[in-house]
């Protein structure tokens, strides 16, 4: 079991859980089909959609293991999550989602996209997380003052699984421009962003609320008891399994 790895991908129409062995060949899998919903002018998935979908895909994968090998899955060697990039999930200090998840499909940030592209001298597509954040600021949305964490779907799941507010550098490149010399956000652009919103007098700066950027092989946390309980409804999955950067 220590030589296995579990990969879970949250695509736009399907959530897939695949367990592989030491030779990287699939051992077992499970999936769950889902659809985004158009709600109040926003393409979204609810938190319930996310967790019931993840749990269903995991349960089917674990059942596949049981059926094929007569083993109750309690541990795997490692876990990795990936999900549709970009979009906007904003949370307060208590971990509450402040507004419904705004997915990559939304084209509601044109003003922010243009202004940030000019400010940074770097193309910022509408779907990027920072465009969503800046558009919420430009709109005067009251939730922005209460933000403690802004992340993507993969970043959210990693946080719930491990308690770590981290993403891999690939995921981060759809959040905010990445400096390939430092493998993190461009420091000068972060400073420009903070300066551009300084007149709002928020209690946070950009680096306070964005996920920390990791590269492949970096420690991205381990599965907590709470995370294991969220993923595996049977309660068989044990805590302590390492996760890679999402």
Q: Which residue stretches match the model-derived regions?
A:
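N-terminal start-of-chain detector that recognizes signal peptides
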Residues: 5, 50-52, 129
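N-terminal phosphate-binding loop and adjacent alpha-helix
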Residues: 30-71, 115, 121
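Glycine-rich phosphate-binding/catalytic subdomain of phosphoryl-transfer
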Residues: 59-246
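Short glycine-rich, Thr/Ser-proximal phosphate-binding strand/loop in the N-terminal lobe
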Residues: 5, 10-48, 96-103
């Amino acid at each position: 079991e220590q030589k296995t790895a579990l990969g879970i991908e949250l695509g736009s129409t399907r959530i897939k859980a695949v367990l592989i062995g030491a030779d990287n060949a699939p051992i077992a899998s499970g999936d769950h089909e889902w659809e985004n919903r158009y709600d109040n002018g926003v393409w979204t998935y609810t938190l319930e959609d996310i967790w019931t979908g993840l749990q269903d895909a995991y349960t089917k994968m674990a059942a596949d293991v049981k059926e094929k090998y007569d083993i109750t899955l309690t541990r795997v060697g490692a876990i990795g999550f990936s999900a549709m990039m970009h979009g906007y999930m904003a949370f307060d200090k208590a971990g509450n989602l402040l507004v419904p998840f705004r997915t990559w499909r939304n084209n509601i940030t044109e003003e922010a996209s243009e202004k940030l592209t000019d400010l940074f001298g770097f193309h910022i597509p509408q779907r990027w997380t920072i465009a969503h954040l800046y558009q919420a600021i430009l709109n005067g949305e009251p939730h922005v003052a209460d933000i403690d964490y802004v992340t993507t779907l993969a970043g959210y799941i990693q946080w719930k699984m491990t308690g770590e507010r981290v993403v891999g550098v690939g995921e981060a490149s759809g959040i905010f421009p990445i400096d390939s010399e430092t493998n993190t956000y461009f420091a000068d652009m972060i400073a420009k962003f903070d300066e551009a919103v300084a007149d709002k007098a928020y209690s946070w700066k950009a680096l306070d609320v964005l996920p920390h950027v990791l590269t492949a092989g970096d420690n991205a946390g381990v599965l907590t008891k709470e995370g294991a309980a969220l993923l595996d409804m049977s309660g068989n999955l044990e805590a302590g399994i390492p996760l890679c950067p999402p």
